[in-house]
């Protein structure tokens, strides 16, 4: 079985593949994961056991990380506690054509999502929207040319910034509001948060497609993708897009002996 991990700024998303099938998924706050290799190793083994994963069957590990200061500890934990050399996805481990961008600046999670999207839709121009800590737009052509896109604060990050910057405002649960014109402060915040982000999504998509000059197939992923499932923005929502991209990159690089 293959252990894959998407280490993000807010959450670590862990998946276990048996062949091409995900048999277990676990999500924890990144802040809850201690930073030493021993603490990480114990945490990973415990988390997998609690989800009925047979640790003895794990024979490979692929990682996407946008938290560089945790990479060494995470890699060391996998080596020490699973006796596996982990594979880290990067610009150097993909056959995406990244010549149009500053490739070293592109996050591993964005690379993984593009790899997975291309595998699912090999003959389409694609727009991948990842709604996580940040909301990112990535455009990749049917010829596997990565064109990048845009980045804006994510839904939760926007809410946190609002509440931290305005002393009389407090946090709210993030849900789609029933109305745009709120009747109290909480519904005001929900309305601004939801419809403000929705407007940004629609406008960034419109401008991206206009600049690209051709229709695109739009895939959403990330923790907040489902929040906008009723809106006419995405062609599909793929919650495990990054995990599947890590798996594909791991298998491709194993063939090359990397």
Swiss-Prot record:
Which keywords label this protein? Answer: ATP-binding, Coenzyme A biosynthesis, Cytoplasm, Kinase, Metal-binding, Nucleotide-binding, Potassium, Transferase
Q: State which Enzyme Commission number(s) the record gives.
A: 2.7.1.33
Q: State the top-level EC class.
A: transferase
Q: Which residues bind K(+)?
A: 130
* Family matches, as InterPro entries: ATPase_NBD, Type_III_PanK
Listed binding positions for ATP are: 6-13, 133
Q: Which GO terms describe its molecular function?
A: ATP binding; metal ion binding; pantothenate kinase activity
Q: Describe which pathway this protein belongs to, using the record's wording.
A: Cofactor biosynthesis; coenzyme A biosynthesis; CoA from (R)-pantothenate: step 1/5
**What residues form the catalytic site here?**
109
Q: Which GO biological process annotations does it have?
A: coenzyme A biosynthetic process
| HAMAP family, alphabetized | Pantothen_kinase_3
Q: How does it assemble?
A: Homodimer.
User: Under what name is this protein listed?
Assistant: Type III pantothenate kinase 1
């Amino acid at each position: 079985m293959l252990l894959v991990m998407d280490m993000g700024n807010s959450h670590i998303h862990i998946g276990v593949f048996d062949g091409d099938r995900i048999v277990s998924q676990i999500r924890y706050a990144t802040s809850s994961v201690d930073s030493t290799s021993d603490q990480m190793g114990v945490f990973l083994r415990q988390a997998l056991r609690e989800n009925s994963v047979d640790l003895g069957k794990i024979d490979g590990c692929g990682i996407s990380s946008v938290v560089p200061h945790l990479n060494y500890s995470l890699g060391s934990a996998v080596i020490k506690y699973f006796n596996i050399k982990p594979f880290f996805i990067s610009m150097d481990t993909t056959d995406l054509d990244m010549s149009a961008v500053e490739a070293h600046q592109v996050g591993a999670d964005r690379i993984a999502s593009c790899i997975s999207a291309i595998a699912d839709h090999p003959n389409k121009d694609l727009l991948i929207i990842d709604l996580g800590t940040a909301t990112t737009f990535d455009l990749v052509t049917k010829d596997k040319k990565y064109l990048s896109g845009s980045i804006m604060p994510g839904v939760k990050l926007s809410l946190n910034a609002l509440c931290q910057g305005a002393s009389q405002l407090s946090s709210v649960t993030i849900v789609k509001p029933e109305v745009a014109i709120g009747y109290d402060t909480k519904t005001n915040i929900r309305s601004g948060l939801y419809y403000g982000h929705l407007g940004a999504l629609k406008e960034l998509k419109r401008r991206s497609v206009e600049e690209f000059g051709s229709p695109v197939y739009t895939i959403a992923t990330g923790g907040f993708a489902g929040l906008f499932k009723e809106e006419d923005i995405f062609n599909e929502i793929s919650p495990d897009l990054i995990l599947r991209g890590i798996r594909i990159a791991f298998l491709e690089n194993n063939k090359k002996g990397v």
